[in-house]
Amino acid sequence: MAITIVVLGISSLTTLNSFVVRNQRRSAERAEAIKFSQESMEWFKIMRQRLSWDAFYQVLLADGSPGVYCLTVLPQEMGEFINLANRACDQDEDEILGRPFLREIHYTLPDPDTIVVRVLVRWTDGTQELTTESTSTIKKWNEQ
């Protein structure tokens, strides 16, 4: 009887330990995904600042609305931004820097003075697909 209680106790501790470890890993991955999402939103706004509103809007309009960019890295050169392909990420090819995350910037152009941006960062934990999402509306302002 005592052996059974000890075995059950050890089994319970092992299960609890693996549950805690899995939750810690999932929390760390979620924090990293949120960081990628925030960086991506800031990058998109920086690209808008580097170009005039009209030039930035025209790049997006030329790619089509709604549009989506898959970003394994955040391009720093304007030419790289302008030449981004309007496409969703491929699970097998488009992970961020060897990390298990896919990053997409979705945008719509509801009118010539507005861009709605949605950043999705996705990853898989076992068989479960997880996602972080952030959304922002960018408005044209007077450029003087």
Residue ranges of predicted features:
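Aliphatic-rich helix starts adjacent to a transmembrane/signal segment
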Residues: 1-38
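Low-complexity, Gly/Pro-rich coil/beta segments used as flexible assembly/activation regions
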Residues: 28-144
